[in-house]
């Protein structure tokens, strides 16, 4: 009988270790905030001069190095002409200021356009977020089209808002 009891303790301990391992793996995966880049070359006969656009989305108020330096250096290294922010820059659970820190320096050097993502809406502070982003010098597109000139190319940018 003692042998059976010892085997149960070992099995319970193994189960505990497996559960603990799975929880740690899930936690570590949740902390993954690596920067992924994908490059596309798009050709169109209407484009007079080559231009480079950087699209940033789903940063979710994560930290990318001290004062967001890792992300900012990555963006600046692209030598882009235009930056589009595709939503979920601000998270509905993490501190908003980290998200604002991610984008505040971008508008100083480049034309930047922003659309709201679902996490900004889920925060319940969508209007505050849009006002704050506008105050950083970033154009917020709210279902409107903006025509801009990029290196002699007329570009129309449409920002669609997600409805609740």
Where are these regions (language model features)?
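Beta-strand-turn-beta hairpins that frame and shape the catalytic cleft
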Residues: 35, 41-54, 138-139, 145-159
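N-terminal membrane-anchoring alpha-helices
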Residues: 1-47
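A generic structural signal for ordered alpha-helices
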Residues: 18-20, 53, 111, 153
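Membrane-embedded segments
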Residues: 50-141
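Active-site-proximal loop/helix segment associated with metal-binding centers of metalloenzymes
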Residues: 161-164
């Amino acid at each position: 009988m003692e042998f059976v009891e010892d085997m149960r303790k070992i099995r319970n301990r193994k189960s505990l270790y497996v559960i603990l391992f799975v929880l740690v793996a899930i936690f570590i995966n949740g902390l993954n905030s690596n920067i992924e880049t994908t490059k596309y070359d798009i050709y169109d006969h209407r484009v007079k001069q080559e231009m480079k656009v950087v699209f940033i989305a789903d940063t979710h108020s994560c930290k990318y190095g001290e004062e967001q330096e890792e992300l900012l250096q990555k963006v600046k290294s692209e030598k882009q002409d235009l930056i589009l922010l595709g939503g979920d820059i601000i998270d509905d659970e993490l501190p908003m200021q980290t998200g604002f820190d991610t984008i505040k320096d971008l508008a100083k050097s480049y034309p930047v356009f922003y659309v709201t993502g679902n996490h900004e809406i889920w925060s319940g502070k969508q209007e505050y977020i849009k006002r704050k982003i506008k105050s950083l010098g970033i154009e917020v597109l709210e279902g409107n089209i903006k025509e801009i000139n990029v290196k002699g190319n007329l570009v129309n940018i449409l920002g669609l808002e997600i409805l609740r």
